[in-house]
From Swiss-Prot:
Phylogenetic lineage: Bacteria, Bacillati, Bacillota, Clostridia, Eubacteriales
EC nos: 2.7.7.3
Site entry: Transition state stabilizer: 17
Any single Gene Ontology cellular-component annotation: cytoplasm
Binding locations of substrate: 9, 41, 73, 87
UniProt subunit comment: Homohexamer.
Catalysis: reaction(s): (R)-4'-phosphopantetheine + ATP + H(+) = 3'-dephospho-CoA + diphosphate
Species of origin: Clostridium kluyveri (strain ATCC 8527 / DSM 555 / NBRC 12016 / NCIMB 10680 / K1)
Binding site for ATP: 9-10, 17, 88-90, 98, 123-129
InterPro entries: Cyt_trans-like, PPAT, Rossmann-like_a/b/a_fold
Gene Ontology terms: biological process: coenzyme A biosynthetic process
Protein name: Phosphopantetheine adenylyltransferase
């Protein structure tokens, strides 16, 4: 059975993330969305909230599980008995960073491989940071994030929401 890990902060999950999850779930028997706990970073959502939001969004994809982890990704992968990392790429700049991370992971564990999936053209500009910025100023985030999480994001900001 092939099992892959799609790691990230997902703060918040975007339609770009969901696209990668959906496509990767068709390539691997099991996909674990690994939600990174970063104690040094104050996120918009707690790790528990992020896990719950993602679970809500992927509930109809039967071979996708969502779990949080802290520490090294390699350690989480060993615990989950996975040897494949899935990463989404939007631009060349993403590739440069992710290539370095892939090489580091390979150095830490030679059995680990990284599979890069290109973002769909309609999501190539999308990031969690840009979604937060738009939402912070009351802009429309419909089409940027799954419908199931729009209200949760809006509630985090004390702004009037503009419908599209």
């Amino acid at each position: 059975m092939s099992r892959a890990i799609y790691p990230g902060s997902f703060d918040p999950i975007t339609n770009g993330h969901l696209d990668i999850i959906d496509r990767a779930s068709k390539v691997f028997d099991e996909l674990i969305v690994g939600v990174l706990v970063n104690p040094d970073k104050k996120g918009l959502f707690t790790v528990e909230e992020r896990v719950e939001l993602i679970e809500r969004v992927v509930k109809d994809i039967p071979n996708v599980k969502v779990e949080s982890f802290s520490g090294l990704l390699i350690d989480f992968m060993k615990k989950k008995q996975s040897q494949v990392i899935v990463k989404g790429l939007r631009a060349v700049s993403d590739f440069e960073y992710e290539c370095q991370m892939s090489l580091m992971n390979k150095k830490l564990d030679p059995n680990i491989d990284t599979v890069f999936m290109m973002a769909s053209a309609m999501n190539s500009f999308l990031s969690s940071s840009s979604v937060k910025q738009v939402a912070m100023f009351g802009g429309c985030i419909e089409g940027l994030v799954p419908e199931e999480v729009i209200i949760d994001i809006i509630k985090k900001f004390d702004k009037a929401y503009k419908n599209c």
